[in-house]
Swiss-Prot record:
Family recorded in the similarity comment: Belongs to the class-I aminoacyl-tRNA synthetase family.
Reactions catalysed according to its record: tRNA(Cys) + L-cysteine + ATP = L-cysteinyl-tRNA(Cys) + AMP + diphosphate
Descriptive protein name: Cysteine--tRNA ligase
GO biological process entries: cysteinyl-tRNA aminoacylation
Keywords attached to this entry: Aminoacyl-tRNA synthetase, ATP-binding, Cytoplasm, Ligase, Metal-binding, Nucleotide-binding, Protein biosynthesis, Zinc
Recorded GO MF terms: ATP binding; cysteine-tRNA ligase activity; zinc ion binding
Organism name: Campylobacter jejuni subsp. jejuni serotype O:6 (strain 81116 / NCTC 11828)
Length: 462
């Protein structure tokens, strides 16, 4: 696999068996939005491709469970820190499951690594990289000769992204430990960690050595990732990561989507209208480094492309596909899966990979038209679809449930009742009643398919 490093601006080859990946996760004070979803889905694809390659992947995604935003939520709601963070961690993980994001090997929470954070600050203090102000302990960026080497930023152009609530030695200096009588004891005084320190301590505790890949949204490159790299370089005496990957912004109407800009589109909002697999397909449909402009029409088109995958599955009578063995050794045998894997190994070239998937589906349908009774052909296509599902992370659902998605239990019972009435009417040659029932269901966007095994129904989503 070759990946474009955000720092070197060139593709770097991953030529080792064991791969370590750390993805910056959410600050858990609210439901996750599509920006969080895209980051998780993009780097879940990376993980799946590596696993399909036969790599052993050690994957961590953290939770920031102590932060100014969480404290503000505490003040507004009257809830404890634990009540808020537990609720939103559970909410986030529910969203990830619906999006078919594989569970990380490690899900560190910042509050579980306070001792490690204090140890890191002590190392930095010992070597003269810190100073004290009235509100906390700060990192002196002027003492780090390589500061800004990660983001290659001109500091003057990025002052607006920095915190300037106190008079620091340098505008780029950042807090390591915030004094706060409500939190943790330390030799520096009671307080809580700064955000940039949290990730470094968790990475050092879990991986111990330089990461192969550090991933996150492009908005984290500066100052968050720059400040992480500085602390690791100065405190741990090593490079934090060999490869840095950053996914592009999710935008709405051309504007970056974020909670701070009050234009978030929550994952749960999208999931009210579209199934998780359709949303996953959509979020994957442009290259991870590209900025992603959300549009309802594009999401609907992504759903139509995914429908074709499921139509082929249905034609083959291929039911639910298990995602269980993705985390274990999986062997890619089909030629199409090997070709798509080769494409994705070039910096996750998803557009080319999905185009090839579309071509494969069209070709498979043509072959089945010509050789509808060829059992070997059918089995080969089934195996290919199963392998492709595990690589892309979509296509696992039972086809009947897929095409009936979005129908409530009560609606389902009513539909089944009407189908039985229609069947009875047809038996009695009461075709006017049978046609009226079909029309009634059609008006509710339900289409009926009469088969030798009975009538089945689908929800029309377009």
């Amino acid at each position: 696999m070759r990946l474009l490093d955000s720092v070197a601006k060139e593709k770097i080859k991953l030529d080792k068996k064991d791969i370590s990946i750390y993805l910056c996760g959410p600050t858990v004070y609210d439901d996750a939005h599509l920006g969080h979803a895209r980051s998780s889905v993009c780097f879940d694809l990376l993980r799946r491709v590596l696993l399909a390659n036969g790599n052993r992947v050690k994957f961590a995604r953290n939770y920031t469970d102590i932060d100014d935003k969480i404290l503000k939520k505490m003040a507004q709601s009257g809830q404890t820190l634990e009540e808020i963070t537990e609720f939103y961690i559970k909410s986030y993980e529910e969203d990830m499951r619906v999006l078919n994001v594989l569970d990380p090997d490690f899900k560190p929470r910042a509050t579980h690594y306070i001792t490690a954070m204090l140890d890191l600050i002590k190392k930095l203090a010992k070597d003269g990289f810190v100073y004290t102000l009235e509100d906390g302990i700060y990192f002196d960026t002027s003492k780090d000769e390589k500061y800004l080497s990660l983001s290659n930023r001109n500091l003057e152009e990025n002052i607006s992204r920095l915190s300037n609530e106190v008079q620091k030695r340098n505008e780029s200096d950042f807090v390591l430990w915030k004094f706060d009588e409500n939190f943790y004891e330390s030799e520096f005084g009671k307080g809580r960690p700064g955000w940039h320190t949290e990730c470094v301590a968790m990475i050092d505790s879990i991986f111990e050595n330089t990461l192969d890949i550090h991933a996150g949204g492009i908005d984290l490159l500066f100052p968050h990732h720059e400040n992480e790299a500085a602390q690791c370089r100065c405190g741990c005496k090593r490079k934090l990561a060999n490869i840095w990957l950053h996914n592009g912004f999710v935008k709405i109407d051309g504007e970056k989507m974020s909670k701070s800009l009050n234009n978030s589109f929550f994952i749960k909002d999208a999931l009210k209208e579209f199934m998780g697999e359709a949303l996953r397909f959509y979020l994957l449909s442009s290259h991870y480094r590209s900025h992603f402009n959300y549009s309802l029409s594009d999401l609907e088109n992504a759903k139509k492309r995914l429908d074709k995958f499921y139509r082929l599955k249905k034609r083959l009578d291929l039911g639910e596909i298990s995602d269980f063995d993705v985390l274990n050794d999986i062997e890619i045998k089909s030629e199409i899966a090997k070709q798509i894997l080769e494409i994705l190994n070039d910096d996750l070239n998803i557009s080319k990979a999905l185009a090839l998937l579309d071509d494969f589906i069209s070709s498979a349908n043509l072959e089945l038209d010509k050789e509808s009774k060829n059992k070997i052909l059918k089995q080969n296509i089934k195996e290919a679809l199963s392998e492709l599902a595990k690589i892309f992370g979509f296509g696992f659902m039972d086809t009947t449930l897929y095409f009936q998605w979005g129908v409530s239990k009560e609606e389902r019972e009513e539909i089944e009742k009407l189908i039985l009435e229609r069947t009875e009417a047809k038996k009695n040659k009461d075709f006017n009643t049978a046609d009226a029932i079909r029309e009634r269901l059609s008006s509710k966007k339900i289409t009926l398919l009469d088969t030798p095994n009975g009538t089945i129904w689908e929800k029309i989503n377009a």
